[in-house]
Amino acid sequence: MKKLLLTTVCGPFGVNTDDCTEHVMPELFHAQVTRSQGIFSIRSTYVSYGLEYIAKNIKTPTTVLQYPTMKQFISEVKKGYAYVGISFVIATFEKVKKMVKAVREAAPQAKIVLGGYGTVLPECEAYGDYICREEGVAFMQRLLKETPDDIPPSHVVYATSGKILGFPAMKGAVVLAGLGCPHGCEFCATSHY
């Protein structure tokens, strides 16, 4: 049975190491959502919910990695995936190149899917077998030959010990008014979508 690996780019961020680029500010990308505000910067763990949302809404067995180290990524790639999907932004394209090279060496049979805002770069086409420049669930369903009718909608929030954020779990639904960054800054590629 075919398997899918979905991942963000590898960490760490904001330091000069072999597996990352020093020009990427840790304030924005080291699993944090903040701007350079010095000691007043609020730290927060950032989860790429888009990847989780895709994984929950396809039938193909899927593993999601959130900011793995390169070592963790390569170890997972070696587990025999048919597809490896990498989500990235423009600032992390150099990392994507290294990750693609690692996939080609560790699992040459795997097809690489590139997605996220970084796909506005025309040069990314040379690195992926498939480029997702649209809504991810529908794209993956087509790629994996799954029909939307086959899969009941599933949400990424789940109860732990019968509770969600400390409250008793109840039946309900999540309505997503939109996916992706809501800001639409003129200088950013997110407005492209």
Predicted features and spans:
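Acidic, low-complexity intrinsically disordered segments
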Residues: 2-193
